[in-house]
C-alpha cells in the first residue's frame, strides 16, 4: 500500500513530506480551513480541552492566523487543488491521498476496483466536518406546488435508494426499506447507526463510508457560515492558492502571452503593409 492505515488515520499525512506531490486537496476554503485548525489543535482535541465544532467555527484573528500558517506549510505537498477531478486521479493511481467527500470516494473506489486499484476512505481520528446538500423552496418560487411534488418524489424510499446508488451520497430518508436494502451481511464491519435509523440499529453490517459508526460521527461537526468573516477567509484562501501554478507554468504562461501579443502585432503589420497607396486629386 502507498499509504498505511496508520498514516491515513490522521490529518498529519497531509503535512508529511514523504507524500509531497502525491496529495490532492479539495478546492474548498471551508474544508481547507476546518482541516487546518483541527490538525493544528490535535493535541488539545486528544486531551478533550477543545471540540471540533468550536475549532471549525472559530473565526477569530488568531484562528485565521493559525489556519493560514498551517495551510502554507502544507502547500508544498499539494499536487493540485481539485473540485471534481480528484476521484479520477485516484483511480488512475496518479495521486495517493485526496482530501475528498464521501460520495466522491464511493465513486472512486468502485471505479478503481474495476481496474485493479485498491482505494479506501477514512475519517481521521482528530475529526472532520459533517455536511449536507438540501432542497428548499424559496419564497419567490413561481411554482411551489411542482417543487413540493419533486421533493416528495425524491423522498420516496425507492427513489432515495436509486439516487444514492447513482450519486454515492446518502439520503436523509431513514425508513426500514432503506436499512433493509443497505444491509450487507458479507461485511465483517458492524456499525452503530442508532443515531440514524433508531435504537434497534446499534450493530449493523453496512457500508462504513455511506453510514459511518456513531463514534465517527461524534468526532465530527458542522461548519457554520462564515458570515461577515467570509471575505477575510477568502483572502486567506487566495493567498494560499495564489502562486500555486509554480515557476515553470508561470513562465509558460508569460511565453504564451508574449507569443500571442507578437502574433497580433505581426498580423496588424501585414494588414497595414498590404494597403495600396492612396492618391489624392486636388480640385482647383
Predicted regions and their residues:
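Juxtamembrane/start-of-transmembrane alpha-helix segments at the extracytoplasmic/lumenal side
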Residues: 240-255
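Alpha-helical transmembrane segments
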Residues: 257-269
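Extracytoplasmic/periplasmic substrate-binding proteins
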Residues: 76-140, 180-181
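Mature extracytoplasmic/periplasmic domains
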Residues: 138-214
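Conserved small/polar residues in nucleotide/adenosyl-binding loops
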Residues: 281-282
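Structured segments of extracytoplasmic/periplasmic soluble domains
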Residues: 17-18, 39, 74, 89, ...
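Extracytoplasmic ligand-binding site segments that recognize negatively charged/polar headgroups
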Residues: 1-94
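Transmembrane-cytosolic junction motif
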Residues: 269-277
Amino acid at each position: 500500500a502507498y499509504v498505511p492505515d496508520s498514516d491515513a488515520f490522521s490529518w498529519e499525512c497531509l503535512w508529511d513530506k514523504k507524500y509531497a506531490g502525491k496529495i490532492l486537496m479539495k478546492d474548498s476554503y471551508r474544508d481547507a480551513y476546518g482541516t487546518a485548525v483541527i490538525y493544528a489543535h490535535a493535541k488539545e482535541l486528544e486531551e478533550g480541552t477543545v471540540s471540533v465544532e468550536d475549532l471549525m467555527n472559530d473565526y477569530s484573528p488568531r484562528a485565521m492566523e493559525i489556519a493560514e500558517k498551517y495551510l502554507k506549510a502544507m502547500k508544498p505537498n499539494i499536487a493540485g487543488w481539485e473540485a471534481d477531478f480528484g476521484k479520477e486521479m485516484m483511480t488512475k493511481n496518479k495521486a495517493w491521498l485526496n482530501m475528498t467527500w464521501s460520495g466522491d470516494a464511493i465513486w472512486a473506489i468502485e471505479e478503481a476496483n474495476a481496474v485493479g486499484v485498491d482505494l479506501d476512505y477514512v475519517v481521521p481520528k482528530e475529526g472532520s466536518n459533517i455536511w449536507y446538500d438540501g432542497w428548499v423552496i424559496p419564497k419567490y418560487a413561481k411554482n411551489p406546488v411542482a417543487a413540493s411534488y419533486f421533493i416528495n418524489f425524491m423522498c420516496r424510499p425507492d427513489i432515495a435508494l436509486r439516487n444514492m446508488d447513482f450519486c454515492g451520497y446518502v439520503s436523509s430518508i431513514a425508513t426500514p426499506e432503506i436499512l433493509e436494502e443497505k444491509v450487507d451481511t458479507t461485511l465483517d464491519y458492524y456499525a452503530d447507526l442508532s443515531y440514524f435509523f433508531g435504537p434497534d440499529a446499534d450493530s449493523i453490517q453496512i457500508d462504513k463510508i455511506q453510514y459511518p459508526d456513531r463514534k465517527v460521527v461524534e468526532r465530527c461537526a458542522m461548519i457554520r457560515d462564515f458570515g461577515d468573516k467570509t471575505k477575510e477567509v477568502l483572502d486567506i484562501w487566495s493567498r494560499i492558492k495564489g502562486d500555486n501554478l509554480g515557476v515553470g507554468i508561470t513562465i509558460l504562461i508569460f511565453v504564451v502571452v508574449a507569443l500571442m501579443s507578437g502574433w497580433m502585432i505581426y498580423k496588424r503589420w501585414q494588414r497595414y503593409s498590404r494597403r495600396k497607396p492612396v492618391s489624392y486629386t486636388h480640385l482647383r
